[in-house]
Amino acid sequence: MALHDFRTRGFLWAFALGLALSAPAAAETRSYVIEWFSLASSSQDGDCPGGVNLPTREQYFKSFELLGKTPEEAKALMEEFAQGGVKGANVRNMLRMRGRVNGEPTNAFVYPWTVADPQLHAVAGKYGLGFNLDGKQGPNGFQDPVTKEAGVDNQLFRALGCIEQFRGTYDYRPTFWAFIWGSMKETTPAWLFSVDGANLDRDGPVTITFDRAIEHQVFGATGDATADVTYRIDPDPRSHHVFKGEIRNGELSISAPGDLVLLLDTLSFTELRLRQTHLRLKPRANGNLEGVIGGYQPWGDIYFSFAQGGLAYEGMILNDTPGIYYLLKKHADAEPDPNTGQNTAISAAYRIEAVPVFAVPADAAIYKAGGGR
């Protein structure tokens, strides 16, 4: 072999090695399934002036008084309510139709504005989880008990936080969400998100992508999501959203807030819609992520999710559904209607926990071949 052949091969090898050494590190992707989702509550003793709202049965007594019944009449009706049978069914129908238009009964859940406002209590405490969405330090701003950020906008917690079933803390899950999320994760495709970056163990810019899975959440006997399961990404673009993000001091966040839509349960919580979406997640020792997601949410969506269950939801896990309508309307703080001035969106924050999984395209070869993992 001629000398120049060795020199040529040596040059090409050195050139290729130089390219390899100078090329940027390959991107890294980690995917997660959202195993827990609930209102970000931060309840404190004494944060409800006038006390926590009455339990449902006592609230029903008040509902009859608002209809003009005397205390004696209201007591008799509640006794019939407790008896069940035909009399109990008649009382339940009275509660269902406790709205009034021109003196005629109307469905209180479909037309909540036809029911007299029961004046439910709202949170007046100092602390609330979430984000300062508007960059202001207004009188309705909370202080986040975890980050200490001031001016936090979470009017959804203010509106619902004096209803016993919605009370909780960062570590203590509210009763309502333990019930509803525990039910929906069995019947609704899972929510996924992926994080892409040069090195996800270091601070730096990342891309955060939200999707919905084709499969439902896989969980074990304890109810916790199973790690390292493979989910197929639903190609439906309605739940596909990409955000610029960053990792700073080990914390994952969205650096360019935008709109997020995630389809959920078509019969209950139809979808999660957030404007100016913010995110804050920290890793746990087991590899899971936990934190808060928030933004401005149409409060009509929230009311529908409660009202569609009618008297059954109200009696079992809520308090006073028309009363919740009035709370949401009063405390809504964004996107005013141009004709009426009524705010149509409410600032909200949700507590989430996520478990590491694998997320692959729906048409991935492993599934086309009939395989799986």
Residue ranges of each PLM-predicted region?
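Bacterial N-terminal signal peptides
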Residues: 10-22
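Sec/Tat signal peptide C-region and signal peptidase I cleavage site
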Residues: 23-27
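Extracytosolic secretory-pathway proteins
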Residues: 28-373
